[in-house]
Amino acid sequence: MSISPEKLASAMALRTISHAGKEKQPCIKMADLCRPGLQFAGYFDIFAFERPQVIGKTEMAYLDNLPEDVRCERLERYFSYDIPCIIIARKMKCPPELLRQARKNGVPVYGSDEETSLFSAKAITDLCEALAPRQTCHGVLLDVFGEGLMITGESGVGKSECALELIKHGHQLVADDVVDISRVGRALFGESPEMVRDFMELRGVGIVDIKAIFGIGSIVRRSRIDLVIHLEFWQEGKDYDRLGNKEKTMEILGVELPLIELPVRPGRSLAMVVEIAARNWRLKAEGYDAVAELDRRLKKHYTHQE
Protein backbone atom coordinates (compact mmCIF):
# COMPACT_ATOMS: atom_id res chain seq x y z
CA MET A 1 0.00 0.00 0.00
CA SER A 2 1.13 3.56 -0.65
CA ILE A 3 -0.21 7.10 -0.67
CA SER A 4 0.93 10.09 -2.68
CA PRO A 5 2.13 13.24 -0.89
CA GLU A 6 -0.70 15.16 -2.59
CA LYS A 7 -3.35 12.87 -1.08
CA LEU A 8 -1.79 13.14 2.37
CA ALA A 9 -1.70 16.93 2.08
CA SER A 10 -5.33 17.02 0.95
CA ALA A 11 -6.47 14.68 3.75
CA MET A 12 -4.72 16.81 6.39
CA ALA A 13 -5.70 20.17 4.85
CA LEU A 14 -2.09 21.31 4.45
CA ARG A 15 -1.08 24.49 2.63
CA THR A 16 0.91 23.98 -0.55
CA ILE A 17 4.10 26.04 -0.45
CA SER A 18 5.74 24.42 -3.46
CA HIS A 19 4.35 21.84 -5.88
CA ALA A 20 6.08 18.64 -6.91
CA GLY A 21 8.23 19.06 -9.97
CA LYS A 22 8.79 15.40 -10.81
CA GLU A 23 6.70 13.29 -13.16
CA LYS A 24 7.13 10.28 -10.86
CA GLN A 25 7.07 11.61 -7.32
CA PRO A 26 8.01 9.01 -4.66
CA CYS A 27 4.99 7.66 -2.83
CA ILE A 28 4.79 7.29 0.94
CA LYS A 29 4.93 3.62 1.96
CA MET A 30 5.62 3.87 5.70
CA ALA A 31 3.35 5.11 8.48
CA ASP A 32 6.11 7.13 10.10
CA LEU A 33 7.79 10.53 9.87
CA CYS A 34 11.33 11.88 9.91
CA ARG A 35 12.49 15.05 11.66
CA PRO A 36 15.79 15.85 9.90
CA GLY A 37 17.64 17.59 12.73
CA LEU A 38 20.64 15.22 12.53
CA GLN A 39 20.83 15.63 8.76
CA PHE A 40 20.93 19.42 9.09
CA ALA A 41 23.82 18.82 11.52
CA GLY A 42 25.63 16.83 8.83
CA TYR A 43 24.91 13.24 9.89
CA PHE A 44 23.59 11.15 6.98
CA ASP A 45 24.76 7.63 7.88
CA ILE A 46 21.26 6.79 9.10
CA PHE A 47 18.60 8.81 7.30
CA ALA A 48 14.95 7.76 6.82
CA PHE A 49 14.63 9.80 3.62
CA GLU A 50 11.72 7.69 2.35
CA ARG A 51 9.42 9.10 5.06
CA PRO A 52 7.64 12.49 5.00
CA GLN A 53 10.05 15.07 6.40
CA VAL A 54 8.65 17.23 9.21
CA ILE A 55 10.48 20.43 10.11
CA GLY A 56 9.59 21.90 13.47
CA LYS A 57 10.78 24.82 15.56
CA THR A 58 14.00 23.09 16.68
CA GLU A 59 15.10 22.08 13.18
CA MET A 60 14.25 25.50 11.78
CA ALA A 61 16.15 27.35 14.52
CA TYR A 62 19.23 25.19 13.96
CA LEU A 63 19.07 25.68 10.20
CA ASP A 64 18.73 29.46 10.56
CA ASN A 65 21.79 29.64 12.83
CA LEU A 66 24.10 27.83 10.42
CA PRO A 67 26.58 29.89 8.37
CA GLU A 68 25.20 30.45 4.90
CA ASP A 69 27.80 28.33 3.10
CA VAL A 70 27.33 25.42 5.53
CA ARG A 71 23.53 25.70 5.30
CA CYS A 72 23.63 25.58 1.50
CA GLU A 73 26.00 22.59 1.53
CA ARG A 74 23.85 20.65 4.03
CA LEU A 75 20.63 21.35 2.13
CA GLU A 76 22.18 20.35 -1.17
CA ARG A 77 23.23 17.02 0.31
CA TYR A 78 19.86 16.65 2.04
CA PHE A 79 17.97 17.06 -1.24
CA SER A 80 20.21 14.58 -3.05
CA TYR A 81 18.04 11.87 -1.48
CA ASP A 82 14.68 10.83 -2.96
CA ILE A 83 12.48 12.64 -0.44
CA PRO A 84 8.68 12.28 -0.90
CA CYS A 85 7.71 15.62 0.67
CA ILE A 86 8.55 18.22 3.32
CA ILE A 87 6.06 19.59 5.86
CA ILE A 88 6.82 22.75 7.82
CA ALA A 89 4.86 23.00 11.07
CA ARG A 90 3.76 25.87 13.33
CA LYS A 91 2.96 28.33 10.49
CA MET A 92 6.70 28.91 10.01
CA LYS A 93 8.00 30.43 6.80
CA CYS A 94 10.05 28.31 4.45
CA PRO A 95 13.71 29.47 4.26
CA PRO A 96 14.65 30.69 0.75
CA GLU A 97 17.52 28.19 0.41
CA LEU A 98 15.27 25.26 1.33
CA LEU A 99 12.53 26.41 -1.05
CA ARG A 100 15.05 26.86 -3.85
CA GLN A 101 16.47 23.36 -3.38
CA ALA A 102 12.96 21.87 -3.14
CA ARG A 103 11.94 23.42 -6.45
CA LYS A 104 15.23 22.43 -8.05
CA ASN A 105 14.75 18.79 -7.03
CA GLY A 106 10.98 18.67 -7.52
CA VAL A 107 10.14 17.97 -3.87
CA PRO A 108 6.72 19.27 -2.73
CA VAL A 109 6.68 21.48 0.37
CA TYR A 110 3.59 21.85 2.55
CA GLY A 111 2.75 23.93 5.60
CA SER A 112 0.78 23.13 8.74
CA ASP A 113 -0.62 25.56 11.32
CA GLU A 114 -0.43 22.99 14.12
CA GLU A 115 2.33 22.44 16.63
CA THR A 116 4.88 19.88 15.51
CA SER A 117 4.08 17.17 18.05
CA LEU A 118 0.32 17.45 17.52
CA PHE A 119 0.69 17.42 13.75
CA SER A 120 3.03 14.41 13.90
CA ALA A 121 0.56 12.41 15.99
CA LYS A 122 -2.30 13.15 13.57
CA ALA A 123 -0.15 12.43 10.52
CA ILE A 124 0.97 9.04 11.83
CA THR A 125 -2.65 8.12 12.61
CA ASP A 126 -3.78 9.13 9.10
CA LEU A 127 -0.86 7.25 7.51
CA CYS A 128 -1.62 4.12 9.54
CA GLU A 129 -5.18 4.14 8.21
CA ALA A 130 -4.20 5.00 4.64
CA LEU A 131 -1.47 2.33 4.47
CA ALA A 132 -3.36 -0.35 6.40
CA PRO A 133 -3.61 -3.81 4.77
CA ARG A 134 -7.08 -4.31 3.30
CA GLN A 135 -9.37 -7.16 2.39
CA THR A 136 -12.96 -7.53 1.23
CA CYS A 137 -15.24 -10.11 2.89
CA HIS A 138 -18.74 -11.33 2.09
CA GLY A 139 -21.00 -10.77 5.07
CA VAL A 140 -22.93 -8.27 7.17
CA LEU A 141 -21.27 -6.04 9.78
CA LEU A 142 -23.26 -4.52 12.64
CA ASP A 143 -22.68 -2.73 15.90
CA VAL A 144 -24.47 -4.80 18.56
CA PHE A 145 -24.28 -3.55 22.15
CA GLY A 146 -21.12 -1.67 21.21
CA GLU A 147 -19.42 -4.77 19.78
CA GLY A 148 -18.58 -5.14 16.10
CA LEU A 149 -20.26 -8.35 14.86
CA MET A 150 -19.65 -9.68 11.36
CA ILE A 151 -22.23 -12.22 10.25
CA THR A 152 -21.02 -14.61 7.55
CA GLY A 153 -22.49 -17.61 5.76
CA GLU A 154 -23.44 -18.85 2.33
CA SER A 155 -25.98 -17.04 0.18
CA GLY A 156 -29.58 -17.56 1.25
CA VAL A 157 -28.80 -18.60 4.82
CA GLY A 158 -30.49 -15.47 6.21
CA LYS A 159 -27.69 -13.02 6.99
CA SER A 160 -29.56 -9.92 5.83
CA GLU A 161 -32.83 -11.02 7.45
CA CYS A 162 -31.04 -11.57 10.76
CA ALA A 163 -29.34 -8.17 10.42
CA LEU A 164 -32.68 -6.49 9.68
CA GLU A 165 -34.19 -7.94 12.85
CA LEU A 166 -31.19 -6.67 14.84
CA ILE A 167 -31.64 -3.19 13.35
CA LYS A 168 -35.30 -3.29 14.46
CA HIS A 169 -34.01 -4.00 17.97
CA GLY A 170 -32.01 -0.77 17.89
CA HIS A 171 -28.62 -2.00 16.70
CA GLN A 172 -26.69 -0.32 13.88
CA LEU A 173 -25.78 -1.43 10.38
CA VAL A 174 -22.24 -0.88 9.12
CA ALA A 175 -22.17 -2.86 5.89
CA ASP A 176 -24.34 -5.39 4.08
CA ASP A 177 -23.11 -8.04 1.64
CA VAL A 178 -19.66 -6.47 1.10
CA VAL A 179 -17.42 -5.50 4.03
CA ASP A 180 -14.19 -3.60 3.37
CA ILE A 181 -11.79 -4.59 6.15
CA SER A 182 -8.57 -2.82 7.13
CA ARG A 183 -6.04 -3.73 9.80
CA VAL A 184 -4.66 -0.99 12.05
CA GLY A 185 -2.13 -2.45 14.46
CA ARG A 186 -3.71 -5.67 15.75
CA ALA A 187 -7.28 -4.43 15.32
CA LEU A 188 -9.60 -4.95 12.36
CA PHE A 189 -12.05 -2.29 11.19
CA GLY A 190 -14.86 -2.70 8.70
CA GLU A 191 -16.90 -0.33 6.58
CA SER A 192 -19.17 -0.41 3.56
CA PRO A 193 -18.07 0.51 0.04
CA GLU A 194 -19.33 4.03 -0.61
CA MET A 195 -21.45 2.99 -3.58
CA VAL A 196 -23.68 0.63 -1.55
CA ARG A 197 -23.47 2.37 1.85
CA ASP A 198 -26.75 2.30 3.86
CA PHE A 199 -28.37 -0.15 1.42
CA MET A 200 -29.46 -3.71 2.12
CA GLU A 201 -30.64 -6.45 -0.23
CA LEU A 202 -33.60 -8.56 0.88
CA ARG A 203 -34.70 -11.50 -1.24
CA GLY A 204 -38.23 -10.98 -2.48
CA VAL A 205 -38.22 -7.29 -1.51
CA GLY A 206 -35.17 -5.93 -3.31
CA ILE A 207 -32.87 -3.08 -2.33
CA VAL A 208 -33.89 -1.06 0.72
CA ASP A 209 -32.36 2.10 2.20
CA ILE A 210 -31.86 1.41 5.92
CA LYS A 211 -31.14 5.04 6.80
CA ALA A 212 -34.28 6.27 5.04
CA ILE A 213 -36.49 3.63 6.70
CA PHE A 214 -35.09 3.51 10.24
CA GLY A 215 -33.36 6.90 10.52
CA ILE A 216 -29.81 8.14 10.89
CA GLY A 217 -29.39 6.32 14.21
CA SER A 218 -29.68 2.94 12.51
CA ILE A 219 -26.38 3.17 10.65
CA VAL A 220 -22.74 3.75 11.55
CA ARG A 221 -19.97 4.42 9.07
CA ARG A 222 -17.19 2.28 10.55
CA SER A 223 -16.76 -0.25 13.32
CA ARG A 224 -14.09 -2.38 14.88
CA ILE A 225 -14.66 -6.10 14.24
CA ASP A 226 -14.69 -8.02 17.52
CA LEU A 227 -16.56 -11.22 16.75
CA VAL A 228 -17.53 -13.33 13.72
CA ILE A 229 -20.83 -15.25 13.74
CA HIS A 230 -21.06 -17.82 10.97
CA LEU A 231 -24.56 -18.96 9.98
CA GLU A 232 -24.89 -22.36 8.37
CA PHE A 233 -27.82 -24.60 7.45
CA TRP A 234 -28.50 -27.26 10.07
CA GLN A 235 -26.69 -30.49 9.20
CA GLU A 236 -28.15 -33.64 10.70
CA GLY A 237 -25.52 -35.56 12.62
CA LYS A 238 -23.03 -32.71 12.92
CA ASP A 239 -21.60 -32.19 16.41
CA TYR A 240 -22.51 -28.60 17.30
CA ASP A 241 -21.06 -26.89 20.37
CA ARG A 242 -23.63 -27.10 23.17
CA LEU A 243 -21.50 -25.91 26.09
CA GLY A 244 -19.54 -23.04 24.56
CA ASN A 245 -16.20 -24.52 25.61
CA LYS A 246 -14.84 -25.04 22.10
CA GLU A 247 -13.09 -21.85 21.15
CA LYS A 248 -12.86 -21.35 17.39
CA THR A 249 -11.22 -18.52 15.49
CA MET A 250 -11.20 -17.06 12.00
CA GLU A 251 -8.09 -15.41 10.58
CA ILE A 252 -8.43 -12.17 8.63
CA LEU A 253 -5.35 -10.18 7.60
CA GLY A 254 -3.25 -12.08 10.12
CA VAL A 255 -5.57 -11.34 13.05
CA GLU A 256 -7.40 -14.17 14.84
CA LEU A 257 -11.03 -13.30 15.56
CA PRO A 258 -13.30 -15.34 17.84
CA LEU A 259 -15.77 -17.37 15.77
CA ILE A 260 -19.21 -18.69 16.73
CA GLU A 261 -20.99 -21.11 14.41
CA LEU A 262 -24.79 -20.96 14.59
CA PRO A 263 -26.91 -23.64 12.88
CA VAL A 264 -30.00 -22.27 11.13
CA ARG A 265 -33.34 -24.06 11.44
CA PRO A 266 -36.86 -22.85 10.57
CA GLY A 267 -38.52 -20.97 13.42
CA ARG A 268 -35.32 -20.19 15.28
CA SER A 269 -35.00 -16.54 16.39
CA LEU A 270 -31.50 -15.85 15.11
CA ALA A 271 -31.48 -12.17 16.08
CA MET A 272 -32.07 -13.03 19.74
CA VAL A 273 -29.35 -15.72 19.66
CA VAL A 274 -26.91 -13.24 18.09
CA GLU A 275 -27.70 -10.68 20.81
CA ILE A 276 -27.03 -13.28 23.51
CA ALA A 277 -23.80 -14.29 21.75
CA ALA A 278 -22.66 -10.67 21.76
CA ARG A 279 -23.44 -10.22 25.46
CA ASN A 280 -21.80 -13.54 26.35
CA TRP A 281 -18.67 -12.62 24.38
CA ARG A 282 -18.43 -9.32 26.25
CA LEU A 283 -18.71 -11.17 29.58
CA LYS A 284 -15.89 -13.49 28.52
CA ALA A 285 -13.76 -10.52 27.48
CA GLU A 286 -14.31 -9.05 30.96
CA GLY A 287 -13.25 -12.29 32.64
CA TYR A 288 -16.56 -14.09 33.31
CA ASP A 289 -17.04 -17.52 31.71
CA ALA A 290 -20.39 -19.26 32.23
CA VAL A 291 -18.88 -22.70 31.50
CA ALA A 292 -16.14 -22.16 34.08
CA GLU A 293 -18.73 -20.96 36.61
CA LEU A 294 -20.90 -24.04 36.04
CA ASP A 295 -17.84 -26.26 36.39
CA ARG A 296 -16.95 -24.53 39.66
CA ARG A 297 -20.46 -25.08 41.04
CA LEU A 298 -20.44 -28.76 40.07
CA LYS A 299 -17.07 -29.33 41.71
CA LYS A 300 -18.25 -27.54 44.85
CA HIS A 301 -21.45 -29.61 44.93
CA TYR A 302 -19.72 -32.98 44.59
CA THR A 303 -16.98 -31.98 47.04
CA HIS A 304 -19.61 -31.29 49.72
CA GLN A 305 -21.30 -34.63 49.00
CA GLU A 306 -18.07 -36.47 49.66
Region spans (language model):
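Flexible, charged surface loops at secondary-structure boundaries
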Residues: D45-F49, Y78-I83, D143-V144, R222-S223
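Charged, amphipathic alpha-helical linker segments immediately N-terminal to NTP-binding catalytic cores
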Residues: D82-C85, K91-D126
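P-loop NTPase nucleotide-binding/switch module
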Residues: D126-G146
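Conserved nucleotide-sensing/catalytic segment adjacent to the nucleotide-binding pocket
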Residues: A175-F233
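Conserved NTP phosphate-binding and transfer environment spanning the P-loop NTPase/kinase superfamily
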Residues: D226-E306
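Gly/Thr-rich phosphate-binding loop signature of adenosyl cofactor/nucleotide-binding cores
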Residues: M1-Y78
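Structural motif
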Residues: R51-V54, P84-I87, V107-Y110, G148-M150, ...
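Glycine-rich phosphate-binding P-loop
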Residues: F145-V174
